[in-house]
Amino acid sequence: YVGSFGDIAVFSFCQDKIISTGGEGGMIVTNNKKLYENIWSLKDIGKNKKKYFTVSKDLNKFPYLHDSIGTNARITEIQSCIGNYQLKKLKNYIRVRNENAKIFFNKLKNCKHLIIPNHNSQITHSYYRYTVIISNEKLSRFILMKNLKKKGVACTVGGCPTIYNEKYFVEKFNVNKKNYPNAEYLKNRTLSFLVDQTINKKDIKKVCNILLDQINKILKNKN
């Protein structure tokens, strides 16, 4: 199986991911037959897979197929067609994302206020987004994002590393955030930029120039 170091790997086909199935969607892969059958049942309203594919042809017999509770998470045929066609473009999408990420790397590598992903020619990164870490504690991500958006730069927070602050985890596990200092540090210091195939390379260079300019202006006002 692909893309995993465990029993199960999960892929998202949401509209902003590397490839999409028309807005929403996803895929689970596993080499564990029992897990596969349980997952299949869960996505198909709790149906028993074996019963479903060996259903009696006796029209007088009602096919009782549901052995458990499940969800209606079945992908549609049109979504599958979109996903299959997107797979043909995947290599090109990743190539373009790497080219765009390299522009970010070359433009930002000398900025001492940011930690950026290392560019390694021996590794092919998928670059869902280009995420940087703000290393200068005098530099507020909130102010930087606000200024960038005023300049028309599309950017988002770099993710949510502190998922233990979600209500479910708080009530279920009573997590102590002191046990996760790295996550606490990153939650307010990451910033992500788009690198997909719809982004013009000139615009990426412009984004980098605006980013560096705004960093310098914010820090200058701090001194």
Q: Locations of the language-model features?
A:
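Conserved active-site segment immediately N-terminal to the catalytic lysine
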Residues: 1-21, 62-66
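Alpha-helical hydrophobic/aromatic positions enriched in membrane-embedded helices and signal peptides
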Residues: 8, 23-24, 69, 188
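PLP-dependent aminotransferase class I/II
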Residues: 31-223
